[in-house]
C-alpha cells in the first residue's frame, strides 16, 4: 500500500501536495490512498497482471525433467550388478502458431490496462476527496452566514413588532408579518444545511474506507490554490 502513497505525481505539472496545501486535506488524501477499497482492488489487479506477464515470459524457458533409471544384471550366476542413472532432460515447447508470443503480448496489454485503470482510480480518489473537503468548508461557511442572517432577521422582526406596538413610524401588521416570515424561512434552512454537512461527511468517510464520522477541516478563507489551473483533472494527477 505504501507504493500507492509514494506513487503520486502531477495535477497538470504540479504535484498534488503543492495543489492541495491544507494539512488536513493532505492527511485525508493519504488515508484515502491507503484505505480506499476501489484503489486497493485496482492495485491487486495490477499485481495479478504482473504475475500473468511473468508466467508468459517463463513459458519461453525450457522445462526440466528427472528420469531416474536402474538395471540389474547377472552373469555366470555371480552376484547381481545394480546400475542406476539419473539423467536430466530438457524440452522446449514448439510454438508453431505463435501461441507463446500472443500470450506474452496479451499479458503485456493487460498489465498496461490495469496500471492505467489504477492510475485513473487514484486520480478519481484524490479529486473526490478534495471536492468533498472543499464542499464541507463551503457548507460550514454557508451555515455560519445563514445563522448570522437568521439572528439579524430575528432582531429586525422583534424591533418592527415593538415599533408597531408603540405606533412608531407607521409600522403596520403586514410589515411585521413579512419580517417574521423572512426570519422563519431562513431559520428553516439551517437544518437542511446541517443535514448536507452530515451526508457529505458520511460520503467522505466511506471514500476513505472508514465508518461515518466527523471530518476535521480548516476554514474556507484560509485555503490557498494556484492562480492558474487548466480545466479538468488530468489523468496524471497520480502516477
Labelled PLM ranges:
Residues 48-52, 183-186:
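A short structural micro-motif
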Residues 9-10, 14-15, 20-31, 35, ...:
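Small/polar-residue-enriched beta-strand and adjacent coil segments characteristic
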Residues 109, 116-235:
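Periplasmic alpha-helical coiled-coil/stalk elements that build and connect Gram-negative outer-membrane
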